[in-house]
Amino acid sequence: MCFPKVLSDDMKKLKARMVMLLPTSAQGLGAWVSACDTEDTVGHLGPWRDKDPALWCQLCLSSQHQAIERFYDKMQNAESGRGQVMSSLAELEDDFKEGYLETVAAYYEEQHPELTPLLEKERDGLRCRGNRSPVPDVEDPATEEPGESFCDKVMRWFQAMLQRLQTWWHGVLAWVKEKVVALVHAVQALWKQFQSFCCSLSELFMSSFQSYGAPRGDKEELTPQKCSEPQSSK
């Protein structure tokens, strides 16, 4: 199946229609992401959403508009068969995903530097989760509409791509949240071990002083909880 070369004006209208489907604000992006589930989907981003919505928009949305521009240029420069259109849409989908991944990494690296090693280690895994499924070679006849124009057909495919992207983004956010929570728990466990070590070291010093005849007195036994409490001056 080969589509005829489309007039420039038609392509401009197509690009405008595609851009209109994208969120245009931080609030709109949050609604777009959470539409496939509940508003808690992006809740773990916490103060980021309220701190600088303009930055969120710039990072997440500008890359999408740039990707649509590249797609528009490809479609305008040559006659497009269905395979080429679907391949270009697949590249567009990957570009969208890459933009989202870069935004997540930029946020956590800035707001939580301690997460940088985790992100560097897990980033490849994050991208693997985002790998798109192969684009089908044959479209389901039930989805075809008689007399459908090239632009209408591309718009229908683009809308289907956005639905897949929405579901994928929901999964990515859940995955990142899971990793962050796991890291916080690991840090808390290490901190408890450090407190226990400090208490054991204190007990060792006290025992050493006792062996030289220093009276222990009626001091209570140290515990990790006691070590973590602020000591009052006497």
UniProtKB/Swiss-Prot annotation:
Cellular component terms per the entry's GO annotation: cytosol; extracellular space; membrane
Domain of life, per lineage: Eukaryota
Biological processes annotated in GO: cell adhesion; defense response; immune response; negative regulation of viral life cycle; positive regulation of gene expression; positive regulation of type III interferon production
Main location group: secreted
Organism of this sequence: Homo sapiens (Human)
Gene this chain is encoded by: IL32
UniProt GO MF annotations: cytokine activity
Record carries keyword Signal: yes
InterPro entries: IL-32
Keyword terms of this UniProt record: Cytokine, Secreted, Signal
Annotated segments matching region Disordered: 213-234
Secretion signal span: 1-30
Induction / repression: Expression increased after activation of T-cells by mitogens or activation of NK cells by IL2/interleukin-2.
Function: Cytokine that may play a role in innate and adaptive immune responses. It induces various cytokines such as TNFA/TNF-alpha and IL8. It activates typical cytokine signal pathways of NF-kappa-B and p38 MAPK.
Extent of Polar residues compositional bias: 225-234
Protein name in the entry: Interleukin-32
Compartments it resides in: Secreted
Tissue specificity remark: Selectively expressed in lymphocytes. Expression is more prominent in immune cells than in non-immune cells.
